[in-house]
Regions:
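Protein-protein interaction interfaces in oligomeric scaffolds
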Residues: 66, 72-73
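Intrinsic disorder/low-complexity detector
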Residues: 4-63, 86, 90-140, 171-203
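Non-catalytic, largely sequence-independent nucleic-acid-binding elements associated
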Residues: 153-163, 194-203
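A structural feature that tracks compact, well-ordered secondary-structure segments
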Residues: 64, 77-78, 141-142, 149-157
């Protein structure tokens, strides 16, 4: 069975999407990159459904930072917020509910947990799919950065990060080159981070 067919059977959806993109262009190169990152990908994305939890926590962190800093770039705090400071106390992970309650306490907005999960950014029928995709990309990119792997290297040949997620909206302008050169610099097309966070929090 070819690598691409094997890849389609895997459960680690977030790691798989980028690899399938690369595999269509160069299957051998994609296989090499995939297995170089396999241990990290499995540890972060597969173990005890951790991929969904980390996406949720990163999303809440992004919303909260938007309230605190307005248009300030959110990416700087995400790696440690997702993995260390915000969800680990004496090696114990906070639950998503605890994060949501803390967000409500600090901002006055209550986020619907039913709408925050690993699949949310893929559901195009959702009213704010564009905004959620923005924060999903924050989460994904920060996780890969923690593994010392830049997105441009993991997703070989990709030029538009949003394109990897079947998302064609012109409101999302995240480019791999921008991630490489400026660390998750984003253009919100007239909407600042606080406005996006408020819209998401109203769900």
């Amino acid at each position: 069975m070819g690598f691409l067919k094997k890849l389609k059977k895997r459960d680690d959806r977030y790691a798989r999407i980028g690899m399938m993109k690369a595999a269509k262009k160069d299957e051998k190169a994609a296989e090499r990159v995939y297995f170089e990152n396999r241990n990290y990908a499995e540890r972060v994305y597969m173990k005890t459904q951790r991929s969904r939890f980390l996406t949720q926590v990163a999303f809440l962190c992004a919303v909260r930072e938007a309230f605190h800093f307005g248009q300030k770039r959110l990416f700087a705090l995400l790696p440690k917020a997702v993995i260390y400071d915000e969800c680990c106390v004496q090696n114990k992970m906070f639950t998503v509910k605890e994060m949501r309650d803390q967000l409500e306490l600090e901002t006055g907005y209550r986020v619907n947990l039913d709408d925050i999960n690993g699949d949310f950014a893929f559901q195009e029928t959702k009213r704010v799919v564009d905004e959620v995709t923005v924060f999903y990309l924050f989460a994904l990119a920060s996780l890969y950065d923690m593994g010392k792997k830049r997105l441009a290297r993991v997703y070989e040949g990709a030029t538009d990060v949003s394109g990897l997620f079947a998302h064609d909206s012109n409101q999302i302008c995240v480019k791999v080159k921008e991630i490489e050169d400026a660390g998750l610099r984003m253009r919100f097309c007239g909407k600042n981070a606080m406005d996006l966070a408020k819209e998401i929090a109203k769900l």
